A protein has these predicted regions:
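Residue position within the beta-strands of beta-propeller blades
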Residues: 68-70, 107-111, 150-154, 203-206, ...
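Beta-strand-rich domains and repeat architectures in extracellular enzymes and scaffolds
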Residues: 42-76, 92-99
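Short loop/turn segments that connect beta-strands within beta-propeller blades
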Residues: 79-83, 127-132, 177-181, 220-224, ...
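Blade-level signature of beta-propeller repeat domains, shared across WD40, Kelch, NHL, RCC1
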Residues: 325-336, 341-365
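Structural motif
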Residues: 72-77, 115-125, 158-174, 210-218, ...
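Sec-dependent signal peptide cleavage junction
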Residues: 17-39
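Repeated scaffold domains used in trafficking and secretory/extracellular systems
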Residues: 53-62, 94-103, 138-147, 190-199, ...
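A short beta-strand motif characteristic of beta-propeller blades
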Residues: 43-51, 84-90, 132-138, 181-187, ...
Length: 365
C-alpha cells in the first residue's frame, strides 16, 4: 500500500502503531491541512515523524548528547553515547505527541487526543526539556520554530464534543510568539496540506476544492502573494524538505513507493532524482529514504553529489521511517519478546545502521 505521507501528524510512526516518535516513524497517517479534517477518526500510526501534512516530521530533535522522541503520551530523551532513555514528560492517557522540535530548552510539538483508535483534536503544545511548564498554545498542528516565532497550521473545532467536530476546519498558516501570543494569519487557506520554512520563505502544498489540481507554492514568510512552483493533476507533492537551495519532495511513483524530485528554490523546473524512494530525511550531503517491497521496508542513503546509493543494514526489521541528525538515526523497528506485550521498538543507531540498540518499546493498539 502506497504511503500517503501528504499527510500525517506524529515521530511520528496503517497498522495503527500510534507512536509519536520525535520525527521518526510515520506510518501512513493522512493528516495535513484539509486532510486533517478528513482523517479525524481514522486510525493512524506515527513516530514523532508524524506529519499533519508532512510537516509533523520531527525537526531538530538533538540537543547536546540527547535526542528527543515520543511514544504515545510520553516524551523521552536518549543519551546518544550511553543509549539510555529518560522520561521527560507524561501526558494524560488519551493524549499523544508527535512532530517534536527542540529549541533553547523547549520542546514544541503537536498534541492530539485519542479516542479508541482515532486521533482527534490537535493542538500546538510546548514543554520545557526538564518536563516543566507544559502548555497548550493553540488549536492547530505542525509547529515550525523559525526566528523567534512558531508557524503552524491553525485549526478550528469544538473540543467539547465527544469526537471530532463536524465543523472542523483548516484556517491556514499562522504565526505566533514562542509563548503563544500575538497570533497572526500568514496565509488564509482551507486547503493547505503541508508546509516548510526555508530562508524566510514558506513552501506549501494545497489541493483545489473545485478541480483535480494540486499545487506547490512559495511565498514570503511575511505573507502576501503566493507563487505557483508546480501544478499537477497527478497527485499531491508530499514530504517536503529544503536542502541547499532545493526543495525535495515525493510525487508520482507506483502502488508502493513514491518517486523523488527536487526543484531549485528560484525555479519552477522539477528534476527527477530517483525512482521508488520515499523521502525520510536529508543530512550532511545524503538523502535518506525507504523502499517498500510488499511487507518489507528497506532503508537507503544516497550521496547527493554523485547519486551513489548505499543500503543501510541494521540488526532489526524496520517498520517505519526514520529521522537523522548529528550522525545518528532513530526509527521504529519490529520488536519480538515473549516476555512482554510490547511489539514495537524505538531503535537508535549511527547513519550506517551500525552500533544500534533498542532504546524503548511499546505496543500497538
Amino acid at each position: 500500500m502506497k504511503k500517503n505521507k501528504v499527510l500525517s501528524l506524529f515521530l511520528a510512526l496503517t497498522m495503527v502503531v500510534v507512536c509519536a516518535f520525535s520525527g521518526v516513524c510515520e506510518a501512513v497517517a493522512v493528516q495535513g491541512g484539509s486532510n486533517i479534517a478528513q482523517n479525524q477518526g481514522a486510525s493512524s500510526v506515527k513516530l514523532s515523524n508524524g506529519k499533519v501534512g508532512s510537516t509533523s516530521k520531527a525537526k531538530n530533535i538533538k540537543s547536546g548528547n540527547y535526542m528527543y522522541y515520543s511514544t504515545r503520551n510520553k516524551i523521552y530523551k536518549v543519551n546518544v553515547k550511553t543509549k539510555k532513555s529518560t522520561l521527560v514528560y507524561k501526558g494524560k492517557g488519551d493524549e499523544e505527541f508527535y512532530g517534536l522540535t527542540v529549541k533553547d530548552g523547549w520542546i514544541y510539538c503537536t498534541k492530539q487526543k485519542v479516542e479508541g483508535r482515532a486521533l482527534t483534536f490537535p493542538y500546538v503544545f510546548r514543554v520545557k526539556t526538564d518536563g516543566k511548564s507544559a502548555k497548550v498554545l493553540k488549536k492547530g498542528a505542525d509547529p515550525v520554530v523559525y526566528k523567534g516565532n512558531i508557524y503552524y497550521i491553525k485549526l478550528s473545532f469544538d473540543d467539547k464534543k465527544s469526537n471530532i467536530d463536524e465543523n472542523f476546519q483548516t484556517l491556514g498558516i499562522y504565526k505566533m510568539s514562542l509563548s503563544g501570543k500575538n497570533d497572526k494569519v500568514v496565509k488564509k487557506s482551507s486547503i493547505v496540506e503541508e508546509f516548510i520554512v526555508y530562508k524566510s520563505k514558506i513552501y506549501y502544498t494545497a489541493m483545489s476544492e473545485t478541480s483535480y489540481n494540486c499545487y506547490l507554492y512559495s511565498m514570503p514568510i511575511t505573507g502576501g502573494k503566493a507563487k505557483i512552483i508546480m501544478r499537477t493533476t497527478e497527485g499531491l507533492p508530499t514530504n517536503l524538505i529544503a536542502y541547499s537551495d532545493y526543495i525535495y519532495f515525493n510525487w508520482g511513483g507506483d502502488e508502493e513507493n513514491y518517486d523523488l524530485y527536487k526543484i531549485k528554490t528560484n525555479s519552477t523546473k522539477k528534476i527527477k532524482v530517483t525512482s521508488k524512494a520515499d523521502l525520510e530525511d536529508i543530512y550532511d550531503g545524503y538523502i535518506y529514504y525507504t523502499v517498500e517491497k510488499g511487507l518489507k521496508l528497506d532503508a537507503y542513503k544516497m550521496k547527493i553529489s554523485n547519486k551513489k546509493k548505499t543500503k543501510i543494514k541494521t540488526n532489526e526489521e524496520i517498520i517505519s521511517g526514520f529521522y537523522v541528525e548529528g550522525g545518528y538515526m532513530i526509527m521504529c523497528v519490529n520488536y519480538d519478546n515473549p516476555n512482554t506485550k510490547d511489539n514495537i521498538g524505538v531503535y537508535l543507531c549511527d547513519t550506517n545502521g551500525k552500533n544500534g540498540k533498542v532504546i524503548n518499546t511499546f505496543s500497538i493498539y
